[in-house]
Curated annotation (Swiss-Prot):
Induction: Expression is up-regulated by caspofungin.
Keyword Phosphoprotein among record annotations: yes
Observed effect of gene inactivation: Leads to thermosensitive growth, enhanced caffeine and caspofungin sensitivity, and alterations of cell surfaces. Also leads to a decreased pathogenicity in mice through displaying a greater susceptibility to nitric oxide (NO), a reduced inhibitory effect on macrophage NO production, and an increased capacity of macrophage stimulation by cell wall extracts.
Organism: Candida albicans (strain SC5314 / ATCC MYA-2876)
This enzyme's EC code(s): 2.7.11.24
Polar residues bias: start-end ranges: 422-444
Protein name according to UniProt: Mitogen-activated protein kinase MKC1
Region Disordered: start-end pairs: 400-448
Segments forming domain Protein kinase: 28-339
Length: 509
């Protein structure tokens, strides 16, 4: 990295990082190169603006944490070169904004998009996000001793974030240790929404919804391996189960070398599925393959993890079931006895608004998607530069508007359904206006009791970790081969941890 005084370009400083232009707000100073790949660069930077600090993610106040004045800045290159990259970037930006503010979901500080100094074209985007010490993959790989309370805390926080995501009818689809960011206080946040998709209870509305499914193989649910077409929120629960097993054993539970081997590894541990389950969750070809295999008995988790808490193994078994209909839900998992030490209804909030994928998922033209991304960046930059009270007011209005639209849509569906069932009564006035809660999508339920919290967990030591959490963007634990799925670099892997950035650049143009 070039340490010379950076020249100014469009009000930003031009830095040399990995022999590429890295153009950032002049009030940030590059501290360290964190990682690079085919489609991006990540650096840590310090916010240098007198005594001011970057606002905290949850309340907009200056944070007192050690990293309060430090951020991770991610440059994504060639963003408009391919439709698939553009669509995933658009997905990521919209979802980061929608979930912004939840303590267990990554949240954005700021966005920036400027023309390339050499070509003058807009083909790069910069994401300013909170700097976290590492990700879960690095912690497990480091061999640091973790207590059972650490396991409980991490899984509980993952489930709190996932509960909020699922309540908005969103499936993450790529949960893995590398997409779980952790700091020295054992705070965990889910990142990387580039592969997320919407979910509907109506299977017909999910048609085509699993296209481009290229999530890391080791954490894929068996119904995906069996080419099942009716996917549910249970696919994310399976991934959480794989993460829990990796925490307990110190290594991934299902480490398939390829697509077929991954399915074989799952069946070796879970055993041959009943015929009724196989017919329900597998394609005809997949069913024939499983029937051709020798019948296998289910392995014992007590033997696989002899030192594990029995309650942890009970939760693991409920998460890792072949039949997605029998898999535990995120809400029931939060109430499991293994997590009762951490259970707090105030932390288990649900989203009050459903995320709208329809507004952009049907857009396929590269130019149109490019314009949508440019608009998203501009709107977000304007939003975060408003006073915190104005931000909250705008967010409240948007959520109320979206809730009203969704209410009307549900009423229309109900009316059409009743007209279909009772055509002679089409003129009947059956539309009823339900109550309208004036809540934001980060609403917190009223709880009378203050739940006691367990003693603070031991802090981590990060000196023996190889790199920052930002490196999860370019790492691939299960390197694919052939045409089975795209390299991790081509997935972009957006999403680091972040926080509210309301007064970051009030006078920045």
């Amino acid at each position: 990295m070039d340490q010379q005084e950076a020249p100014i370009y469009y009000g930003r400083s031009v830095n040399k990082v990995y022999n590429q232009e890295f153009i950032i707000d002049s009030r940030f100073k590059i501290v360290k190169e964190l990682g690079h790949g085919a489609y991006g660069i990540v650096c840590s930077a310090k916010y240098d603006n007198g005594s001011k600090k970057v606002p905290d993610s949850n309340n907009g106040n200056a944070s007192s944490s050690a990293n309060a004045s430090f951020v991770a800045i991610k440059k994504i290159t060639n963003i408009f070169s391919k439709n698939i990259l553009c669509k995933r970037a658009l997905r990521e930006l919209k979802l980061l904004q929608f979930f912004r503010g939840h303590k267990n979901i990554t949240c954005l500080y700021d966005l920036d998009i400027i023309p390339n100094p050499m070509t003058g074209e807009f083909n790069e985007i910069y994401l300013y996000e909170e700097l976290m010490e590492c990700d879960m993959h690095q912690i497990i790989r480091s061999g640091q001793p973790l207590s059972d309370q650490h396991y409980q805390s991490f899984i509980y926080q993952v489930l709190c974030g996932l509960n909020f995501i699922h309540s908005a009818d969103v499936l993450h689809r790529d949960l893995k240790p590398g997409n779980l960011l952790v700091n020295a206080d054992c705070e965990l946040k889910i990142c990387d929404f580039g592969l997320a998709r919407g979910f509907s209870e109506n299977p017909d509305e999910n048609a085509g919804f699993m296209t481009e499914y290229v999530a890391t193989r080791w954490y894929r649910a068996p119904e995906i391996m069996l080419s099942f077409t009716n996917y549910t929120k249970a696919i994310d629960i399976w991934s959480v189960g794989c993460i829990l097993a990796e925490l307990l054993g110190g290594k991934p539970l299902f480490r398939g070398k390829d697509y077929v081997d991954q399915l074989n590894q799952i069946l070796m541990i879970l055993g041959t599925p009943p015929e009724s389950t196989l017919q329900r969750i597998g394609s005809h070809r997949a069913q024939n393959y499983v029937r051709s295999l020798p019948i296998t008995r289910k392995a014992s988790y007590e033997e696989l993890f002899p030192d594990a808490n029995p309650l942890a193994l009970d939760l693991l078994e409920r998460m890792l079931t072949l039949d997605p209909r029998e898999r535990i839900t995120v809400r029931d998992a939060l109430n499991h006895k293994y997590l009762e030490l951490w259970h707090d209804p105030k932390e288990e909030i649900e989203c009050q608004v459903k995320f709208d994928f329809k507004s952009f998922e049907t857009v396929d033209g590269l130019d149109e998607m490019k314009q949508l991304i440019m608009d998203e960046v501009q709107k977000f930059r304007e939003f975060v530069r408003k006073p915190i009270e104005e931000q909250q007011r705008i967010q409240m209005q948007l959520h109320m508007q979206k809730r009203e639209e969704q209410r009307q849509e549900e009423e229309e569906k109900e009316l059409l359904e009743q007209q279909r069932q009772f055509p002679a009564q089409e003129s009947m006035d059956i539309s009823q206006t339900p109550y309208n809660n004036l809540e934001t999508n980060i609403g917190t339920p009223q709880v009378e009791d203050d739940y006691p919290r367990p003693q603070e967990l031991d802090e981590f030591t990060f000196s023996n970790l190889e790199s920052s959490s930002s490196m999860n963007l370019f790492q691939d634990m299960a390197k694919p081969s052939g045409e089975e799925y795209i390299k991790l670099e081509e997935e972009l892997g957006f999403g680091l941890d972040g926080a509210m950035f309301n007064n970051y650049c009030n006078d920045h143009q």
